[in-house]
């Protein structure tokens, strides 16, 4: 019996959307393992009998409760009416239309059906194509490298000392320029910088001047030199924009502090009670969290809006930036972000607009605001399995399935997939110092679709608890670097860049019930297929996997000697926290 109460579909968002200017993706949800087959019946609404087709739907993902199905449709006239035929094991079918469930198909094709009115090109969410090929590297500027001691702040401490909330070590833009060859050799092709604008703190999220690089980092001209040097190496550059709030030394806020309601900037901020003060630790004005030094900007004010849009415009036009990462993006009004996107895309249609949001973000990812968000839900899925070891492989696969079904495919393709940042405990620390477990998490990140980001120093084995210890100085002494881990990162980045299948959407998890901590999955495209096995257990495992392509020329990559390929199966002996990556060309393609 089909469990109708589990069936779900609606127009729009991640259920019925334009993937590109000629293709629609239609999705439906059913109870897990309850419906063996679904057909999508669709047609042209103004002549449905002449232009109609039946498309078998594919199970695109599953989680603990549901299966998610998808069909791609290219309507000849860009319009579509449709309904679903859900088939049971006994041959019966249920027909699902906008009006509900029926035991017979519609007598008239266009009555009571779901309706996609028209595929307007302007409505298609089209993230920049380059982001799908990008591998980001996050740099916390104050801690990456000190290339110019002449701009060190007063009281600068010796490089490599213990970080605190308020100390400085002299990292700057020249230090980044000096190490661009290192980043090129690592293989990354995009850099994301924490804030660079003038501020009082070491993290610079308390902006004092949005039009000026902080003097301890360098000058505006030095940033232009850095951007040009990155572009010459094929690297993109993303800067952090803090538009939710400013710093307490931002001149308009200083004016409000001094003049209260008489300040011409009084409406630039969200003041609940005058005069501005802090009562029992709570400011009388809205802030980021309850930080008195970070007053929240009123982006509904036309002057504030014009000022911030000019900031976004200036740095793209003058410096040639490739996009913005938007801090605390979910606390800024949607209308401002719509205008921001329009202005940024007018200047550079290929600019990447990335929002910092740590929860479900569908309202911001419909093509009118952000291209992507920082995918912290993905982060937590990986950390709970590989680092904290709170879940098993089946639960991991189910959580990934929920994520895949939660967004349109083009959003998933550019989702910012990170394993750590300046706001999290370091990956190696979460893995209890176990480098092999850290490798497994990184391996999945770099063989999964989306846009991976590496937090500076993770590749050499840097550790650190939560802020401020996760913001240590980059270790440049090679004798103190984990060079074997660095070689692993370089190898995996190279593998990802060489094989489009590892960046595409083809994904299937293969359950191995006798080994609950063994994660096995396939990645593929039209030309090649990968089988990847990750043993997230402190004991060796021996596993036999039926070959997805019997007779295919499967080969291990990266020199793993642990897998034996036979005609109908693949046998692997994996050491504790070991892995195997196998590759085969699709039949009929060149190897």
UniProtKB/Swiss-Prot annotation:
Protein name, UniProt field: Cyclomaltodextrinase
UniProt-annotated binding residues for substrate: 245, 325, 422-423, 467, 471
Family assignment from sequence similarity: Belongs to the glycosyl hydrolase 13 family.
Subunit details: Monomer.
Species lineage: Bacteria, Bacillati, Bacillota, Bacilli, Bacillales
Catalysed reactions listed for this entry: cyclomaltodextrin + H2O = linear maltodextrin
Temperature dependence, free-text field: Optimum temperature is 45 degrees Celsius.
Swiss-Prot/TrEMBL cofactor(s): Ca(2+)
Lineage: superkingdom: Bacteria
Membrane-crossing residue ranges in chain numbering: none
């Amino acid at each position: 019996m089909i469990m109708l109460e589990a069936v779900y579909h609606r127009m729009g968002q991640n259920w019925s959307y334009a993937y590109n200017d000629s293709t629609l993706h239609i999705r439906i949800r059913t109870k897990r393992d309850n419906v063996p087959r679904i057909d999508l019946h669709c047609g042209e609404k103004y002549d449905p009998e002449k232009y109609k087709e039946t498309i078998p739907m594919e199970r695109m993902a599953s989680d603990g409760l549901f299966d998610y199905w998808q069909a791609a449709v290219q309507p000849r006239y860009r319009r579509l009416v449709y309904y679903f035929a859900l088939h049971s094991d006994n041959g019966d079918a249920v027909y699902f239309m906008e009006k509900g469930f029926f035991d017979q198909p519609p007598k008239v094709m266009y009555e009571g059906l779901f309706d996609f009115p028209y595929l307007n090109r302007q409505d298609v969410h089209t993230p920049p194509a380059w982001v799908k090929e990008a591998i980001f590297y996050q740099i916390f500027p104050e801690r990456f490298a000190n290339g110019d001691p002449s701009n060190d702040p007063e009281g600068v401490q010796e490089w490599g000392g213990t970080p605190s909330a308020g100390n400085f070590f002299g990292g700057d833009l020249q230090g980044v320029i000096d190490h661009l060859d290192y980043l090129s050799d690592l293989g990354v092709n995009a850099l994301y910088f924490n804030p660079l604008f003038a501020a009082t703190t070491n993290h610079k999220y308390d902006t004092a001047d949005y039009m000026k690089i902080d003097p301890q980092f360098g000058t505006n001209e030095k940033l232009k030199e850095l951007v040009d040097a990155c572009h010459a190496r094929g690297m993109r550059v993303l800067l952090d924009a803090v538009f939710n709030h400013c710093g307490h030394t931002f001149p308009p806020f200083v004016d409000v502090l001094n003049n209260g309601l008489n300040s011409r900037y009084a409406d630039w901020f969200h003041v609940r009670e005058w005069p501005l003060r802090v009562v029992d630790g709570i400011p009388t004005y809205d802030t980021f969290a309850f930080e008195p030094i970070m007053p929240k900007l009123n982006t509904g004010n036309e002057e504030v809006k014009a000022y911030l849009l000019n900031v976004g415009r200036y740095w793209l036009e003058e410096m040639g930036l490739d996009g913005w990462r938007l801090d605390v993006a979910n606390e800024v009004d949607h209308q401002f972000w719509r205008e921001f996107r329009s202005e940024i895309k007018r200047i550079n249609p290929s600019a990447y607009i990335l929002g910092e949001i740590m929860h479900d973000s569908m309202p911001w990812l419909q093509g009118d605001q952000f291209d992507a968000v920082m995918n912290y839900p993905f982060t937590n899925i990986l950390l709970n399995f590989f680092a904290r070891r709170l879940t098993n492989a089946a639960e991991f696969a189910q959580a990934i399935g929920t994520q895949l079904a939660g967004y349109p495919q083009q959003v998933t393709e550019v989702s910012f997939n990170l394993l750590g940042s300046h706001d999290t405990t370091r990956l190696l620390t979460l893995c209890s110092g176990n480098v092999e477990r850290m490798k497994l998490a990184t391996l999945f990140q770099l063989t999964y679709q989306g846009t991976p980001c590496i937090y500076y120093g993770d590749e050499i084995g840097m550790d650190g608890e939560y802020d401020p210890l996760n913001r240590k100085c980059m270790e440049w002494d090679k004798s103190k670097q984990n060079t074997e881990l660095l070689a692993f990162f370089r190898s995996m980045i190279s593998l990802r860049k060489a094989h489009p299948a590892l960046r595409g959407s083809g994904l299937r998890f293969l359950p191995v019930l006798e080994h609950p901590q063994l994660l096995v999955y396939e990645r593929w495209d039209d030309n090649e297929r990968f089988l990847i096995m990750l043993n997230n257990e402190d004991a060796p495992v021996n596993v036999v996997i039926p070959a997805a392509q019997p007779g295919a020329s499967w080969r291990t990559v990266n020199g793993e000697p642990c897998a034996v390929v036979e005609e109908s199966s693949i046998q692997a002996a994996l050491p504790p926290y070991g892995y195997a990556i196998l590759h085969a060309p699709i039949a009929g393609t060149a190897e």
